[in-house]
Every structure is written in C-alpha cells, then in structure tokens.
C-alpha cells in the first residue's frame, strides 16, 4: 500500500493548484491520500513553525504508517518545515517540497525534491 500525506501552507490549502493536482495524480497512481490541517496559525512563519510542527505531529500519530510500503510527503511553505522535520524523525526519504522555507533546509535529505 502507498500513502501520500499533504502538508499545506498557512494560506495555501490542499484545494489550491499545486497540492490539488498533486493529489489527483497520486490518486491515479493508487496512493491513499491523507491531509494535514493547520488551525489558528500566525501568518508570521517564525512564530508559527513550532505550533505547525506540533499540529502536524499530533495528526501523523493517528496514521498507521507501518501499514504502508511506501510513504510520500508533499508539502508547501510552512508545511515543508513540518514534513522535513517529521521525515527526519521517522527516517522517511520520499518528499516533494513546494517553496521550502529557510528553516526547512536543515532537515532536507539528499533524496528530497
């Protein structure tokens, strides 16, 4: 089984083109899709990055990641920070980042796009 988890930006949700079309393509490739949802984040990215990460981690814990043979994170903006940090933590290597932030870079891995 294959899983794709989408991490939105603060104002760029999964119904916007980059994530919407990514989701459609992945569904056609037989990925199960899960979406992270952020609530009440400050538009100042430096202020909101830790809260966004906490919210993403809380939601990821509800997914049975061990049930999947392949896991892909697709993320945008503040979501790139959360996805990169969680991928580092869970030792996952499949990531696609749209508009990564400066503080995302410390968690990027060689195989990331």
Predicted regions and their residues:
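Gly/Ala-rich beta-loop-alpha elbow adjacent to hydrolase catalytic centers
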Residues: 71-83, 87
């Amino acid at each position: 089984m294959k899983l794709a988890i989408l991490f939105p930006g603060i104002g760029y949700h999964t119904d916007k083109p980059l994530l919407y079309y990514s989701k459609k393509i992945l569904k056609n490739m037989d990925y199960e899709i899960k979406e992270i949802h952020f609530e009440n984040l400050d538009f100042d990215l430096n202020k909101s990055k830790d809260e966004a990460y906490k919210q993403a981690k809380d939601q990821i814990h509800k997914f049975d990641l061990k049930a999947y043979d392949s896991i892909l994170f697709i993320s945008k903006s503040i979501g790139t920070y959360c996805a990169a940090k969680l991928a580092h933590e869970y030792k996952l290597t499949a990531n696609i980042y749209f508009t990564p932030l400066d503080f995302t870079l410390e968690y990027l891995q060689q195989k990331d796009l």
